[in-house]
């Protein structure tokens, strides 16, 4: 290939500007490097054999012409696969040691080696980099006389060329300007490439930011949807809670009304107990109406109370149907007076005297019936809750049996009073007492056994007087006469129950 006569290019080696001149004449390559700052020069001549032997040693053989073309491409920077570098001997040895993996050798002591420079042609392939070193001995600074001669010869040549053809001068000037423009455009190209790389990076970053923003928007939309759903659920839950609050408030009002009715019932029972204690048996018509009204209110309160058991409601209903029409004072009446022991003892003695009188009258009547040949058998009595002991029915048992029966009744009553812990249980107990009385009133006394005494017959007038006396005292007037022992046991049991009930009420007053 025909090579140019010469080529001079300014090249930057490690930040220092150098002038590189290449001249190829036949099979000889002349290479000169000059430092623009210090004017130091390094020059070398290489024939084709040296170049080919150098490329063979590196492991990548190149012919002389190809090597010259590679050097020209590196100087003009027309190919990215070939570049140039200027190294000292020390730099070259360190490069060789790194390539071979050994330690760098000691620095040379020769000044000639230190002053020598090596122009390195670097050929970069896909997976390898080959270095072709060209040694350039130091030539020193140029001689001023020689430089002046060169300058004069160049001026003469320049004048001759200008005189020969002015058009060629213009062409050369244009070429020089074009070269400068090419250099400037090459630098601008490099700057634009760098700017393009930065723009691509920014575009990639912006795309990632947009994707992240889209994902955040989707997350926000999902959270807003969940928030609306939670608000809907919260509104429904609040509505249910408000309904529960209204229902509980209504139940509370019903419970308060039931409590007021129970308190009124308790006061009514206290008043009834006080009236029973005083021995009042006959009641006016107005009191009966009040009692019926109170009974209706209590039945309404029991119907609204959900905590009552069905068995207790049925028992209370049965007792309310069979309860006698006793007076019920107003719940807002005065407080029941406290228990008076002296009055209670006097009333008890009075009742005992009445019992003895009734017993004597019954014995007299039995003697009269026995004397007249009557059988003396009365109608049988059916008891729904308890069975009378034979000693209390026949009248043949002695006083010890009667007292034992009375004491057992008192003990059972006291044990029941001790188990009563609320007003509702006290209400059931008072109703059970009234029920037992009604059962006795509705039932028939047991048939008395004839008494082995005198057979004196009582008159009809005495029997009528005895019935009127029982009616005035509030007791049940039997259709047929029954045993005096049975009456005594019944009255004693009633007294014992009233006494135990009074003690229980006293304990309640003491607690309050």
Swiss-Prot record:
Entry keyword Cell wall biogenesis/degradation: no
Modified positions (Phosphoserine) in chain numbering: 328, 330, 372, 375, 447, 473
Major subcellular location class: cytoplasm
Residue ranges, annotated region (Disordered): 282-415, 430-472
UniProt modified residues of type N-acetylmethionine: 1
Cellular compartments per GO CC: centriolar satellite; centriolar subdistal appendage; centrosome; ciliary basal body; cytoplasm; microtubule organizing center
Biased segments, Basic and acidic residues type: 287-300
GO molecular function, one term: microtubule binding
Annotated spans, Head domain: 1-142
Residue spans crossing the bilayer: none
Residue positions where Phosphothreonine is found in the record: 282
Coiled-coil region: 176-203, 246-273
Note: The N-terminal 3D structure (head domain) resembles that of NHEJ1/XLF, PAXX, SASS6 and XRCC4.
Swiss-Prot/TrEMBL domain comment: The coiled-coil domains are involved in microtubule-binding.
Protein name (database record): Centrosomal protein CCDC61
């Amino acid at each position: 290939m025909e090579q140019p006569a010469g080529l001079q290019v300014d090249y930057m080696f490690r930040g220092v500007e150098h002038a590189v001149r290449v001249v190829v004449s036949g099979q000889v390559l002349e290479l000169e490097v000059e430092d623009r700052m210090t004017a130091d020069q390094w020059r070398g001549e290489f024939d084709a054999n040296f170049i080919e032997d150098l490329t063979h040693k590196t492991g990548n053989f190149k012919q002389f012409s190809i090597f010259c073309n590679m050097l020209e491409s590196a100087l003009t920077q027309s190919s990215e696969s070939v570049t140039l570098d200027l190294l000292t001997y020390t730099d070259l040895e360190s490069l060789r040691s790194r390539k071979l993996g050994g330690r760098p050798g000691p620095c040379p002591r020769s000044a000639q080696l230190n002053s020598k420079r090596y122009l390195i042609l670097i050929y970069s392939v896909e997976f390898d980099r080959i270095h072709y070193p060209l040694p350039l001995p130091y030539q020193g600074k140029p001689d001023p006389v020689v430089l002046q001669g060169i300058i004069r010869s160049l001026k003469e040549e320049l004048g001759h060329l200008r005189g020969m053809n002015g058009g060629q001068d213009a062409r050369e000037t244009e070429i020089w300007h074009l070269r400068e423009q090419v250099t400037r455009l090459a630098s601008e190209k490099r700057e634009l490439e760098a700017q393009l790389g930065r723009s691509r990076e920014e575009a990639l970053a912006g795309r990632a930011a947009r994707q992240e923003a889209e994902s955040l928007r989707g997350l926000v939309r999902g959270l807003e949807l969940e928030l609306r759903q939670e608000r809907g659920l919260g509104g429904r839950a609040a509505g249910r809670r408000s309904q529960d609050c209204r229902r509980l408030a209504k139940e509370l009002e019903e419970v308060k009304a039931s409590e007021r009715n129970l308190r009124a019932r308790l006061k009514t029972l206290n008043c009834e107990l006080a009236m029973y204690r005083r021995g009042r048996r006959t009641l006016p018509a107005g009191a009966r109406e009040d009692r019926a009204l109170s009974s209706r209110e209590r039945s309404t309160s029991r119907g609204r109370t959900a905590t009552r058991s069905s068995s207790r409601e049925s028992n209370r209903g049965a007792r309310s149907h069979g309860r006698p029409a006793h007076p019920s004072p107003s719940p807002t009446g005065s407080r029941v007076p406290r228990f008076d022991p002296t009055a209670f003892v006097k009333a008890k003695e009075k009742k005992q005297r009445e019992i003895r009188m009734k017993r004597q009258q019954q014995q007299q009547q039995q003697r009269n019936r026995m004397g007249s040949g009557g059988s003396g058998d009365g109608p049988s009595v059916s008891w729904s809750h308890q069975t009378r002991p034979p000693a209390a029915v026949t009248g043949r048992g002695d006083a010890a049996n009667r007292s034992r029966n009375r004491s057992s009744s008192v003990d059972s009553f006291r044990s029941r009073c001790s188990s009563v812990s609320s007003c509702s249980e006290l209400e059931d107990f008072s109703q059970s007492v009234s029920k037992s009385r009604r059962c006795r009133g509705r039932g028939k006394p047991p048939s008395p056994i004839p008494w082995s005494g005198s057979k004196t017959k009582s008159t009809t007038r005495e029997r009528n007087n005895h019935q009127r006396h029982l009616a005035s005292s509030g007791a049940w007037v039997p259709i047929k006469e029954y045993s005096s022992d049975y009456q005594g046991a019944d009255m004693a049991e009633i007294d014992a129950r009233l006494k135990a009930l009074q003690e229980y009420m006293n304990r309640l007053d003491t607690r309050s």
